[in-house]
């Protein structure tokens, strides 16, 4: 899958020579990179100013790896599934990028601070977040839904195949 200058695909496919390649073997974890919500989040990351990044519900690490290749640093990801954390770490190593993947409950425990938070999870999960970031990219829900993030103003909505992603900026920014 090509998104701007990024290419996301499995290890058995060859990326285009002009692309930043995100090679992903999902293993038992969620996330091959092909879902419309992943594409929407990647489009948002391509347009934002890189800084520190937190990926809530990191799955196989697609968004974290892409962010690291785009210059975001440091990159941290949390997921409730230990198989996802293991897959994210393995995929990051295979892509030669540095990330910090941790098992954590994003809705229950305090989240690490980052300039940008990306959350490609259910609408309920997005609403439960209390991010401490300047910018929040949300997805994982239908176009008929839109999360409300107190203290943030809505900036951009993207839609693809019935799915949506939104970019929010902290009110004081």
Model-identified regions with their sequence ranges:
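Conserved SAM/SAH cofactor-binding pocket of Class I
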Residues: 28, 32-107
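Non-catalytic substrate-recognition/targeting regions of SAM-dependent transferases
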Residues: 1-32
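Short, charged/polar, Gly/Pro-enriched secondary-structure boundary elements
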Residues: 16, 172-173
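S-adenosylmethionine
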Residues: 43, 80-169
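Surface-exposed, flexible loop/turn segments at secondary-structure boundaries
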Residues: 14, 61, 144
């Amino acid at each position: 899958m090509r998104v701007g200058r990024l290419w996301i695909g499995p290890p058995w496919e060859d990326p285009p020579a002009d692309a930043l390649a995100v090679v992903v073997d999902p293993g038992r974890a969620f996330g091959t990179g092909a879902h419309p919500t992943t594409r929407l989040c990647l489009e948002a990351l391509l347009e934002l100013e890189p800084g520190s990044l937190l990926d809530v519900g990191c799955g196989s690490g697609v968004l974290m790896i892409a962010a690291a290749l785009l210059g975001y640093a440091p990159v941290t990801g949390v997921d409730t599934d230990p198989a996802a954390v293991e897959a994210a770490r393995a995929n990051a190593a295979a892509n030669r990028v540095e990330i910090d993947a941790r098992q954590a409950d994003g809705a229950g425990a305090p989240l690490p601070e980052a300039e940008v938070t990306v959350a490609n999870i259910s609408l309920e999960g997005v609403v439960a977040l209390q991010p401490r970031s300047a910018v929040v990219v949300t997805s994982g829900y239908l176009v008929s839904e839109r999360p409300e993030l107190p203290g943030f103003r809505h900036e951009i909505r993207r839609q693809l195949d019935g799915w949506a992603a939104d970019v929010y900026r902290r009110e004081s920014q």
